[in-house]
């Protein structure tokens, strides 16, 4: 199960993990905050 981060403006979902962290320059804690701020919890 991968928890994705949904960016409404882009309409894309990215799995959390090292690749996402490198791409966005975010750490897991930041992604956690982003998920709650966006209000999206996607399961893939």
From Swiss-Prot:
Q: Does the record bear Hydrolase in its keywords?
A: yes
Q: What induces it?
A: By water stress.
Q: What class of enzyme is it?
A: hydrolase
UniProt catalytic activity: Hydrolysis of terminal non-reducing beta-D-galactose residues in beta-D-galactosides
| Disulfide bond residue pairs | none
Family assignment from sequence similarity = Belongs to the glycosyl hydrolase 35 family.
- GO molecular function (one): beta-galactosidase activity
N-terminal signal peptide:
none
What EC number(s) does its UniProt record assign?
3.2.1.23
Q: Give the miscellaneous note.
A: On the 2D-gel the determined pI of this protein (spot N76) is: 5.8, its MW is: 32 kDa.
Protein name (database record): Putative beta-galactosidase
- Keywords tagged on the record: Glycosidase, Hydrolase, Stress response
UniProt keyword annotation of Secreted present? no
């Amino acid at each position: 199960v991968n928890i994705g981060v949904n960016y409404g403006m882009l309409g894309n979902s990215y799995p959390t993990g090292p690749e996402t962290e490198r791409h966005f320059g975010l750490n897991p804690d930041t992604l956690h905050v982003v998920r709650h701020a966006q209000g999206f919890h996607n399961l893939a």
